[in-house]
Amino acid sequence: MKMPKKIMTYCPYCKKHTSHSVERVRKRKASELKAGQRRFRRVTSGYGGFPRPKFEGREKPTKRIALRLVCDECHKAITPPGIRAKKFEIVEA
C-alpha cells in the first residue's frame, strides 16, 4: 500500500480539516527493567518450561501498520486505527 506524505484530514484540536504529515510508528526496544520483564525472567530461569501455554490459534496473514498524523498548523499528533497491509510505503504525492 502506498500512502502520500501529506494528507488533508480533520484535526480534533484545530476543529477543522488541515494538512497532516504522515509518519510510521515503529516499535521501540522493550525495557529490561520493567516489573513484568523481571518477573518473566525469574519464572523462566532454572528448571521447568515456559510459564504460559503455547498459543494454539492461527497466525494472522499481515501486521497492522501504526501511523501518526501530525497537524501542520498546531503540531499535535493523532493516531488513526491501524491498517492491515503486507507492504507499506510513504511516497511523495
Swiss-Prot record:
Q: Which InterPro entries match?
A: Ribosomal_eL44, Ribosomal_LSU_eL42, Ribosomal_zn-bd
Write out the GO biological process terms: translation
Keywords, sorted A to Z: Metal-binding, Ribonucleoprotein, Ribosomal protein, RNA-binding, rRNA-binding, Zinc, Zinc-finger
- Which amino acids does the record list as binding Zn(2+)? C11, C14, C71, C74
What residue intervals traverse the membrane?
Answer: none
- Taken from the record, one Pfam family name reads Ribosomal_L44
GO MF, one example: large ribosomal subunit rRNA binding
The cross-references to PANTHER family, in alphabetical order and at most eight, read: 60S RIBOSOMAL PROTEIN L36A/L44 (PTHR10369)
Provide the family line.
Belongs to the eukaryotic ribosomal protein eL42 family.
Which HAMAP family does this chain map to?
Ribosomal_L44e
The annotated subunit structure for this chain is: Part of the 50S ribosomal subunit.
Q: What is this protein called?
A: Large ribosomal subunit protein eL42
- Originating organism: Thermoplasma acidophilum (strain ATCC 25905 / DSM 1728 / JCM 9062 / NBRC 15155 / AMRC-C165)
